[in-house]
């Protein structure tokens, strides 16, 4: 939790860090990724058979090594909008017998050369957990049950045996399953009303948890503060008594919300992720309201929020049907840093967050035939995923604030926008980690930092100006490591992200 006191421009800023005040445990799944059959994410990104940089499975080795640097804990698959017409059975078995299908989300052709077994094997090579999204567009409950049985079944059943026939004896034990993707959207095949979806999701969840009670189910929400989110939570957040047990089984483990932010001007761009912070706060209250109104027993585990699509994305600048290949600048990197600060600050409520996407498609990581490019947005992800773990701890900032335009406009009325955006953690290793993002375009900010004593390791991400990118053959934005003796105030450079790290 970070609190804020607004100062005048003439007053001296300060930051106080309190490692003894632990707020909540951080779920490492907030650093999850996403791989959709869209653009060059799968074909030419994750999977590139015949390329000298690929292994015997066709997996790009340089992509695997890069994602290992990010310690990605979970990858969502196969979409996204793609899931609404995807039939998993097309993507298993001998490749020469897999059908090519028209793909209606991004208007391409899906060859099905990369499917369930390839993805789950790729996850094992990467060392990450899979998160599969069920087709609640053209798909059926029988198809969903079959997919769970194919992945997780241990009995002598048709689909578990089909998995064995296809070369995988042991179950994959896929834990996370989404009940559809953005089924409320007018762009979806088989768009649903909230009433239709809530009824369907409830019935599907019962059946899926009867088949495999160990799985966790993610409800399809909208942006969070909407009537869709309230209604679907209210209608599905009920204890269900299994005929096999007298204990109450929670149907819904997480509630999914999505949001993308972007603006052509720097300051509206870097303050836009605060809309996500307010969305999390409201969604958390809706979860509590549904539990209260439905009389859910307090001992039943409270669902968390699964922010399983988030990023900086301007769909005009990077059109989805054309592969959505963004060229990110320093301003976008700082916006991603603010997004990640939000997830750390709200760790009590966020059980998972998946940046969309992990390779090539609005991604921090781009591939060419000859290698990879780490975009500006790579560096905040790298720092957070490697250091901002453990516990969220209390921090207080005193600084002046940006008072101009926000995007969306309603952010101005509901969130403070200080010049310094801050989150703080205490790791299991006993180190305090503090991220400070100076969003000011033109001015470094000198602030007294209460908390550290002795040597402080400092990581800084910045560049010549907010518009510089790494996509023009030169790395304009990277990572610089220095040391600081913690004497006197610290100057946070203009348009920069700084991570300070010291032993508590």
Curated annotation (Swiss-Prot):
The positions flagged as glycosylation sites are 81, 152, 269, 329
Cell location: Secreted
- Describe its function: Alpha-L-arabinofuranosidase involved in the degradation of arabinoxylan, a major component of plant hemicellulose. Acts only on small linear 1,5-alpha-linked L-arabinofuranosyl oligosaccharides.
Protein's name in the database: Alpha-L-arabinofuranosidase C
Q: Which GO terms describe its cellular component?
A: extracellular region
Q: Please report which protein family the annotation says this sequence is part of.
A: Belongs to the glycosyl hydrolase 51 family.
Which reaction is catalysed here? Hydrolysis of terminal non-reducing alpha-L-arabinofuranoside residues in alpha-L-arabinosides
Q: What is its EC number?
A: 3.2.1.55
